[in-house]
Regions:
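Metalloprotease/metallohydrolase-associated module, dominated by Zn2+-dependent proteases
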Residues: 2-37, 96-160
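General N-terminal targeting signals
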Residues: 32, 60-62, 84-86
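Short, internal acidic amphipathic alpha-helical interface segments
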Residues: 79-102
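Short, charged, low-complexity patches
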Residues: 75, 79-83, 129-133
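Active-site scaffold of zinc-dependent metalloenzymes
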Residues: 41-79, 89-92
Length: 160
C-alpha cells in the first residue's frame, strides 16, 4: 500500500492542492482546465502518430500548452498517458515556454510541426522527473471519474 508519507513532498503538495481545488473525483477535462488556469493559457490535447516507444509528450508554446498523445492508444492507455503528461505540467517540469519553441504559437505549430523534433525536444527529462510524473499520474488516476477508464477496484486498493 502506498502511504502519503512515502511520497516526495512536492508530489504530496501537488496532489493535495489538486484534490482540494477539484474535489475527490474529477474528470480529465476538469484537470486540463485546472492546469490551463494555473498556467494562464489553454492546454490542448492532440493525437498524432508517434514512434512506438513514445506514447506522449508535452511542450509549452507562446500562447498555449500542448500534449501530444500517440494515435490509436487504448482508452486506458490514452488516459494514463494524458495524466502522465499533465503531471509534468503540475510538477513544473515544463517551463512557461519550452526551449526552442519561443516563436511557436498554436497556429504556427500546427501548420509546420516536425514531430520528430518535438519528440526530441521534449524527451530530455531526467529519470527523477519521469518517476515523479508517473507517481503523480498514478495517484491522479484514483481521482478520475471516467467510468470504465478509471483504475480497477483491486488496483485502487493497492494505493490506499
Amino acid at each position: 500500500m502506498m502511504d502519503m508519507l512515502q511520497l516526495p513532498s512536492n508530489i504530496q503538495a501537488v496532489l493535495s492542492t489538486t484534490v482540494q481545488f477539484l474535489g475527490e473525483t474529477f474528470t480529465l477535462d476538469d484537470l486540463v482546465l485546472h492546469i490551463a488556469g494555473r498556467r494562464g493559457k489553454p492546454l490542448h490535447i492532440l493525437e498524432h502518430p508517434l514512434d512506438a516507444a513514445t506514447t506522449g509528450c508535452c511542450l509549452a508554446l507562446i500562447d498555449a500548452d500542448i500534449i501530444i498523445i500517440r494515435a490509436g492508444l487504448s482508452p486506458s492507455r490514452y488516459l494514463n498517458t494524458c495524466l502522465h503528461e499533465c503531471a509534468h505540467f503540475l510538477l513544473h517540469h515544463i517551463p512557461q515556454v519550452t526551449a526552442g519553441a519561443e516563436q511557436w504559437t498554436v497556429e504556427t505549430f500546427l501548420e509546420d510541426v516536425n514531430f520528430q523534433n518535438v519528440r526530441r525536444r521534449t524527451s530530455m527529462y531526467d529519470k527523477p522527473c519521469e518517476d515523479a510524473a508517473e507517481s503523480l499520474a498514478t495517484l491522479l488516476t484514483l481521482h478520475i471519474a471516467n467510468g470504465d477508464m478509471s483504475m480497477p477496484l483491486f488496483a485502487r486498493n493497492l494505493y490506499k
